[in-house]
Curated annotation (Swiss-Prot):
Protein name per the record: Unknown protein 3
Lineage, highest ranks first: Eukaryota, Viridiplantae, Streptophyta, Embryophyta, Tracheophyta
Length: 8
């Protein structure tokens, strides 16, 4: 996972 995935 990445930070971008957590924001979605």
């Amino acid at each position: 996972c990445s930070v971008v995935d957590l924001a979605r």
